[in-house]
Amino acid sequence: MSVLITKIKLYNFRRFREYVIEPNEKCNILIGDNESGKSTILEAIDLVSSGNMRRLEAIGLDNLMNIEAVTEFVNGSRCYNDLPKLRIELYLSETSDPTVNGENNSDKKECDGIKLVCEPNEDYRTEITEALLTQVDYFPYEYYSMRFSTFADQAYTGYKNKLRCAMVNSDKMDSEYATNDFIKRTYYQYTEGDPKERAIFKSKYRQMKNNFRANSLVPLNGRVPQDKHYTFGLKSSVATDFENNLMIYEDEISIDNKGTGKQIFIKTDFALEHSGSNVDVILLEEPETHLSHVNLRKLVRKIAETQNGQLFIATHNSLISTRLELNNVIILHCDSDNKPVVLKDLSADTAKYFRKVPPASITEFALSRKSILVEGPAEYILFEKFYETVSNHRPEDDGIQILDVRGLSFKRYLDIARLTKGKVAVVTDNDGDVLENCIEKYADYSDNANIKICYDTDESKHTFEIVLYWDNKELCDELFSNSAQQYMLNNKTEAAYTLLCQDKGINVPAYIKEAIEWIRR
C-alpha cells in the first residue's frame, strides 16, 4: 500500500516564512503567479523524501533559508536565541512503520511523518555569539546543523527511504545529472523488493569489466614498452559503477538521445507505470513544456487514468487544470497568507463541465485578483479600447484580466470566484428580460460583494450591438451605411473590428463603464 502526504508544513524555506498545505489524496494541481512557490513545494517534497545530505549541502543552506528571516535577524537583535530555523515537515498517512511515528513535529501530535530541520549547532554557540558581536551583516550559515529525521526522531538517508518519490522536471531535461538521477531512482524503485539483486548486478558488471581488461585489452597492452610498467584499463570510480552507467531505452534508442518533449513523456510514463507499488508520490514540474498540444493531451489522459499513488503537478496550463478536475487545483499567490486557495469544494457538476468544454483560460481566471467576463468576441475585441477610454489605463496595468466567456458559462466561473475570492464583473446582455436574465439568474451571487452583474436596463436594447449602435449612431451609420444596426447584428466580430480600427472616439455604453469603474475600486 502506498504512503500518502496528508500535510506539508514549511518554515523559513525559500520564499515561505510559514506555509501549510493539506493536499488531496490523489491529484494536486499547483497553479500560481511567477515566483509564487509552485516549484518550491515540489522541491520541498523531493528534498525531504530523498534524505540526501550530499544534495542538500550542494544546494547550500544560504540558498534555502528564507531571505526575509535572515534580513530580519541581521537587522534585529542578532542574539543567538533568535536565530531562525528552517523546517520542512511531511505528515504521512499511516505507514505501519514504527520508526516514522512520534510527536517530534510542530503540531506536537503523535502521527507518521518525516522532516528536515536546519538550526544553529549548539556545539558552536560560543563561535556564533562571538562572530555576531564582531561582524556586521553576518549570518552563521556554516554553523548550522542539517538533519533528516522521522517524527520518531530517527535519522534516515536515501538508502532508507520512508517516502518513495519520483521527480520529472521539464526544466532540467537536458541535464545529464537529472537524467542519471531519474534512472538511478527508478532502478532503486524497481529493485527495492530484492536488495540482493542489486548486489548481483554490481558483481556481474564488475566481472564483465575485469574480463574485458584481462582479455580484450591484451593486444593493446602488448604494444606498451615493458620497462614502462604502464597498462591500459577501465576507469574504476563511482561515476563509472553499474548504477551510474544504466540507461533507459525506447526502441533501442536511449532517452538522452530523444527530444526534450519525448523525454518528458517517457519519464512521466515510467513514473506513472509503477505509482502506488514502487512509487508513492510523483512530482511533475510543468509537463506542458516542450510538448505539442496533441502529446500534451496524451500525457494528460495517461495521468488521469492513473489510479494509484499521489500526484503533484506544477503548471500554467488550463488543459491540465481542467482535464484533471478543477477540484484538484491548489492556487498559490505571491502575496497570500500562510495557506493556498483550494478548489476541492467546487461542485462536482462545475468541475465536470470544465473538463468537457475547451479550457478557455481557466487558469488565468483562477489566478486573477480582478477579472471582467464578457459575453462574446465582439465585446472582447472592443473592451480594451473601452477600458482605456474610461480609465486612461490598460487593463494589465491595473492587474485586470478580460475574458471572453459564453453567457451560459458565467455562473460556472462565478462558482470558482466564490472560492478564490477574486473580484469579478460580469458584462452581459439582458436578452429582452432584465428580471429573468440579469437579476433572478444571478440571485445566488447577489450577496457577494466581490461579484457584480452589469447590463443595460432598456429591454429594447437586448444585445450589445444594439446598445453600441444607439450610443454611437452617427459613427456607425457612417461606417456601415443606413442599415448599420442590422449589419452589426449580422456581422458582430467584423463590425467590432472595424470600430476598433477607425480613428474616431467611441462612446462607452453606460453598463460597461459601470463595470470598469467598479472593478478598479
Language-model-derived ranges and their functions:
Residues E43-K108:
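Conserved P-loop NTP-binding catalytic core
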Residues C79-L83, S106-K109, F139, L272-S277, ...:
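Conserved catalytic network of the ASCE P-loop NTPase/AAA+ motor domain
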Residues D62-C79, S347-L367:
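Surface-exposed acidic, glycine/proline-enriched linker/cap segments
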Residues M1-S49, F242-E364, Y380-I381, E388-V390, ...:
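Switch/communication elements of ASCE P-loop NTPase nucleotide-binding domains
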Residues T186-I266, F270-V281:
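Extended helical coiled-coil dimerization/tether regions that scaffold
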